[in-house]
């Protein structure tokens, strides 16, 4: 990795961290009655989001949903099976039970994220995003049109790639 790539990675991490901190700061300001300050924090957080997006695009280049899902499965697996369990053990050894509980809870959530991404990756790999073996309800997120069937039928001249239709979630949440 060259210096510019290192800088793009560091900038992405910094902008991402700033976005989350500013979102947190906005909540604090709002709780304290500083609504205008909260709005400024939120606006700045949104700016930081776009800075980070430009940096990650430059760093990673073009990718596909399939590749992104595969990377997401790997990342969530690392977090759920290695990172957070290790952090929990370290917190326990240091006597910080609250942090240990938090890390263990997050590990479970990351496992759920991994499993969800894996289901979606399997759906993409098996070309089952817009078709099912059994009829399901498909709903247009723009006009509210609901259709029940095994294959999504597009309405209102909306292209498939526009994500106007969503299915009933294949997940239990």
Regions found by a protein language model. Give the residues of each.
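Non-heme di-metal
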Residues: 1-173
């Amino acid at each position: 990795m060259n210096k510019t790539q290192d800088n793009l990675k560091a900038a992405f991490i910094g902008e991402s961290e700033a976005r989350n901190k500013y979102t947190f700061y906005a909540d604090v300001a709002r709780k304290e009655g500083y609504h205008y300050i909260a709005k400024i924090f939120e606006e700045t957080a949104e700016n930081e989001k776009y800075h980070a997006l430009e940096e990650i695009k430059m760093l990673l280049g073009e990718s596909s949903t399939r590749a992104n899902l595969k990377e997401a499965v790997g990342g969530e697996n690392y977090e759920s099976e290695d990172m957070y369990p290790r952090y929990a053990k370290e917190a326990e050894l240091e006597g910080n039970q609250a942090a240990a509980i938090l890390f263990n809870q997050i590990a479970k959530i990351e496992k759920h994220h991994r499993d969800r991404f894996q289901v979606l990756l399997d759906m993409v790999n098996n070309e089952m995003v817009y078709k099912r073996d059994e009829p399901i309800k498909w709903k247009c997120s723009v006009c509210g049109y609901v259709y029940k069937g095994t294959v999504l039928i597009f309405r209102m001249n909306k292209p498939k790639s526009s994500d106007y239709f969503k299915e009933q979630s294949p997940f239990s949440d």
